[in-house]
A protein has these predicted regions:
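Short glycine/serine/threonine-rich phosphate/pyrophosphate-binding segments
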Residues: 12-22, 44, 78-82, 96-109, ...
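Accessory alpha-helical/coil subdomains and C-terminal extensions
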Residues: 95-100, 106, 110, 138-156, ...
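Phosphate-binding loop/pocket of nucleotide- and phosphate-handling active sites
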Residues: 250, 303-340
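Flexible, glycine/charged-enriched surface loops at secondary-structure junctions
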Residues: 31-36, 155-162, 214-216, 252, ...
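N-terminal phosphate-binding or glycine-rich loops at protein starts, especially the Walker A/P-loop
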Residues: 1-44
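Glycine-rich oxoanion-binding loops at beta->alpha junctions
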Residues: 43-96, 103-104, 136-143, 147, ...
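Short, acidic/small-residue loops that bind anionic groups at enzyme active sites
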Residues: 30, 34-37, 111-144, 189-196
């Protein structure tokens, strides 16, 4: 059997560990593996590399992806779908393992509906893919954000400042919630719960009356209650989203204007995606890769590997990409217990 692997969308710690897991299990099964370069672009343009056990040495701890990645969608390119079909047929690919987030997996699902032998592995540091409890890369991103929050506590206390820490999370606030709770944040603002900037300012004033410095964690997609915060037009990108670094700066500016407290902003940005995966993510990513190779051997096409209740299982790919997974309200209530 001949397997192919691709990595699409944004990079995440653990991608290489997944590739390594696929190759090791496939080799054990007597299968051959190739890796398409730069996501769906490599499939469309027939660009790939051979993958074997020897070539995967050192990948367990290595960040990024040796295959490269793009956000190219073959359905948005002229002849993209047919080009993919020609490539898979020309190379005798029996199973294509697509490792990616919502966009990559949605493409994989559409390809499956057209008869392609495709299956998916969920990848996103945002941990927002439905049907799976944990995606690799999330734990590493939380660790990075938590460390930043911990370091900023001493600066906030030394200067009696408010420190605003913006972390990734365009549509959901998993990273912000977990890192805010683990790092001892004073307030955590996430997309699922629109905030009232007046209430934020009041909470911080109450803290400072008790001589407490403050850390405010803000997910990049956090939204104010409509009508409570004026947002300049140049703060939005072409898709109507507040630009990375935008909401953190806006919140910091409003805090200063409303309270008089000196406020500084730190944007963690892409550092959350980079570098070595944590020990947990190395194990999780490896498990995902091994299970994906087993699914390919079983011809379990149109499905996605999912981590549920401490084990790996298989779920319908269409169901997995049908909706986002939001922050557990009970967990946010726990975080709220320690806010302000």
């Amino acid at each position: 059997m001949k397997l192919a692997v691709l990595t699409g969308g944004g990079d995440a710690p653990g991608l290489n560990a997944v590739i390594r897991g696929v190759v090791r299990k496939a080799t054990e099964n007597g299968d051959e593996v190739i890796g398409f370069l730069d996501g769906w672009r490599g499939v469309m343009e027939n660009e790939f590399m051979e993958l074997d056990v020897e070539g995967c040495r050192g990948l367990l701890t290595r960040g990024g992806t040796v295959l490269g990645t793009t956000r190219i969608n073959p359905f948005m390119r002229e002849d993209g779908r047919d080009a993919c079909r020609r490539t898979l047929e020309a190379n005798g690919v029996d199973a294509l393992i697509a490792i990616g987030g919502e966009g990559t997996l949605s493409c994989a699902h559409e390809m499956y509906k057209l008869g392609f032998p495709v299956l998916g592995v969920p990848k996103t540091i945002d941990n927002d893919i439905g049907s799976t409890e944990m995606t690799f890369g999330f734990a590493t991103a939380v660790d990075i954000a938590t460390e930043a929050i911990g370091r900023l506590h001493t600066t906030a206390e030394s200067h009696d400042r408010v420190m605003v820490v913006e972390v990734m999370g365009r549509h959901v606030g998993h990273i912000a919630t977990w890192a805010g709770l683990a790092g001892g944040a004073s307030l955590t603002l996430i997309p699922e719960h629109p905030f009232d900037i007046a209430e934020v300012a009041d909470a911080l004033q109450r803290r400072h009356k008790r001589k407490f410095a403050s850390i405010v964690v803000v997910a990049e997609g956090a939204k104010p209650v409509p009508g409570t915060l004026d947002i300049p037009e140049d703060s939005f990108d072409e898709f109507g989203h507040i630009k990375l670094g935008g909401i953190g700066e806006l919140v910091a500016r409003e805090i200063t204007e409303r309270t008089g407290f000196e406020t500084r902003t730190t944007v963690r940005g892409y550092v959350q995606r980079g570098g070595e995966p944590s020990a947990f993510d190395r194990v999780l990513a490896t498990w995902y890769g091994v299970e994906a190779a087993s699914m390919a051997a079983d011809k379990a096409f149109g499905q996605m590997v999912a981590y549920q209740c401490g084990s790996m299982t298989r779920v319908d790919l269409g169901e997995a990409v049908a909706g986002l997974k939001y922050v557990n309200p009970d967990l946010y209530k726990v975080a709220s217990t320690f806010m302000a």
